[in-house]
Design a protein with these regions (language model features):
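Conserved catalytic-core motifs of GNAT/GCN5-like acyltransferases
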Residues: 27-34
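Glyoxalase I/VOC metalloenzyme domain signal
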Residues: 1-3, 9-27, 39, 46-218
Length: 218
């Protein structure tokens, strides 16, 4: 298992565009639409094998018959996305996800599409992050082919993605149980820390210099 992408929840893609331009000095490329969830996104490569995603409710899409992923319904209802996008969590790539995922009353395995892309996605049914964002949702791209290599590099480069939690030993044990490969080049960007509360820290090198963003725990 390895890190696949890091996700921000946004009020809208217009907000995400403005945020990226102000904080990073870049214009984010369009991704596409997710009919199953009624969402759309912006995506950009930030390291070999890793991309950054800003996701928002698609105002042109019909409301889905399920809770949207990345807690977008709750975050919008509570007004937590009014000021700026939130660093929500991350997604890990796990080959064979459809064979190995264990569904439960709290979790579900979905078949998802965006344009010509197809993938399996495993997450909490209520759309919330696991362990304040320290544990990932999981993805398995059809054919094992992540779209990251075809994504535009706009000058955002991942320096570090830190996971902090009061029970970090348990978090790491769960990741190890899922097959976390510490030697994988992508996973070397991920750091672990003890903390009083769950938190995420994303450090990016950007045209505006090095930028540190705090999030998680939402």
């Amino acid at each position: 298992m390895k890190i696949d992408h890091i996700a921000f929840a946004a009020q809208s893609l217009d907000q995400a565009h403005a945020y990226a331009l102000q904080r990073f000095g870049v214009k984010l490329p369009a991704g596409g639409k997710h009919p199953l969830m009624g969402t759309h996104n912006l995506v950009t490569r930030i390291a070999p094998g890793i991309f950054l995603e800003f996701i928002a409710i698609d105002p042109e899409a019909p409301a889905p018959n399920r809770t949207r992923w990345f807690a977008l319904d709750r975050l919008m209802q509570e007004g937590k996305l009014e000021d700026a996008p939130l660093l929500f969590g991350w997604v890990a790539s796990l080959p064979g996800l459809a064979r190995n995922a264990i569904e439960s009353p709290q979790h579900e395995l979905l078949e998802v599409s965006r344009g010509g892309l197809r993938w399996h996605f495993f997450h909490r049914k209520d759309g919330e992050a696991e362990a304040g964002g320290c544990l990932p949702a999981m993805i398995d791209w059809a054919g094992g082919n992540s779209p990251v290599d075809n994504m535009q590099d706009v000058g955002l480069h991942l320096n570090q993605f830190q996971l902090a939690h009061p029970e970090m030993a348990a978090i790491r044990a769960k990741l190890d149980g899922l097959g976390w490969d510490a030697a994988c080049p992508e996973n070397r960007y991920v750091a672990f820390a003890d903390a009083a509360q769950p938190a995420l820290t994303l450090v990016l090198d950007t045209p505006n210099g090095r930028v540190q963003i705090e999030g998680g725990g939402v």
